[in-house]
């Protein structure tokens, strides 16, 4: 009879025990890519995250300094299948937190009994119209060459911002490598977006598969999967919309373009009701592709006949542009990205400058002010400018960077541009003063 084999070494026994203990633990249940957003409902916050496997959707939270998990909320998850060759599956979880105390700070984590995230914190929206919120504004941020990311992370941690506005173009691109590029990007921005509401609009880099990655990964107010929506904060009504409906209509139809236009008109009409405009006098829009720019890349905004600005006459029926609509309803500030540069415009309408005065151009201007802030950093690097700026171009820079915005009160708004190339130096600033809002302000 053969001799019995020698006993396994202690290390192997330990490994076998560990494997046995974890053999039945599900793989891929850990929450990741956590981010929050305003749902457009007072005293609420929406928490979104993903997991590789299906799990329960739970957020445990409590007031900062109080009992850690005194509240619990449950939500739901939806399956998302990446359209790449691998058809990778992920689950997107959404949980709505309600009855939050305005302006109070909360600690939370998300997940389930199969795995919890680390601890995060946020401040509930201050519902007062006298609230003076601070924003970070940028577009065109990728997971490769994200020049502004580290500075935004630090400023988020020290409480500089109440809201982040990401004005289109994420990751470069969310769908690439069967969605893994999107996963990595969402993990990168978690250090910002899990703490401060991360509000978005779609850009041209989200176009693939009918914007499915953008629609699945982000959670914005309304029922259009974040393609267009509006919300209120402090003295402002903020409108997010898609410029891409003017460019991908052959792939996805004209219906979205006309539906969005009619929604925009109805939303602007409602915002301009006297009682609403008195309460929230500032109307701010955010869309990816600008109406105007002085870049040298032959983009839509470099042409007088910009599709976003004037519409398209090559469609049936013709598609209306947005400049006249925004002017008609007295939009104060229009935020754009797409160009990998920063450009501040003089108050402009119909390609003409309408400064408040030669000495104080941004005091009671007679047209909307446009800001292009698409230089946060991505693999496509910088864009360039034409040598001689247009008459409506007030300041421009090719530095990597982002924009800070402070809504001071009903009449004053402050904006500044931060250069990453110059180690956080403020390279441009503007105070917009509006003693009168609405279309009557243009007269």
Curated annotation (Swiss-Prot):
Which reaction is this enzyme known to catalyze? a phosphate monoester + H2O = an alcohol + phosphate
Tell me which InterPro entries the record gives: Calcineurin-like_PHP_ApaH, Metallo-depent_PP-like, MPP_PAP, Purple_acid_Pase-like_N, Purple_acid_Pase_N, Purple_acid_PPase_C_dom
Q: What class of enzyme is it?
A: hydrolase
Tell me which UniProt keywords the record has, alphabetically.
Glycoprotein, Hydrolase, Iron, Metal-binding, Secreted, Signal, Zinc
Detail which positions bind Fe cation: 140, 169, 172, 340
SUPFAM superfamilies recorded: Metallo-dependent phosphatases, Purple acid phosphatase, N-terminal domain
Cofactor binding notes:
Binds 1 Fe cation per subunit. Binds 1 zinc ion per subunit.
Q: Please state the Enzyme Commission number of this protein.
A: 3.1.3.2
State the Gene Ontology terms under molecular function.
acid phosphatase activity; metal ion binding
Q: From which residue to which does the signal peptide run? A: 1-23
Record's subcellular location? Secreted
Q: Where does Zn(2+) bind?
A: 169, 204, 288, 338
Q: Which cofactor(s) does the record list?
A: Fe cation; Zn(2+)
Q: Which GO terms describe its cellular component?
A: extracellular region
List all annotated glycosylation positions. 53, 76, 126, 210, 313, 355, 409
Pfam families from the entry?
Answer: Metallophos, Metallophos_C, Pur_ac_phosph_N
Under the heading PANTHER family, the entry gives: ACID PHOSPHATASE TYPE 7, PURPLE ACID PHOSPHATASE
Concerning its family, UniProt says:
Belongs to the metallophosphoesterase superfamily. Purple acid phosphatase family.
Q: What is this protein called?
A: Acid phosphatase type 7
* Natural source organism: Danio rerio
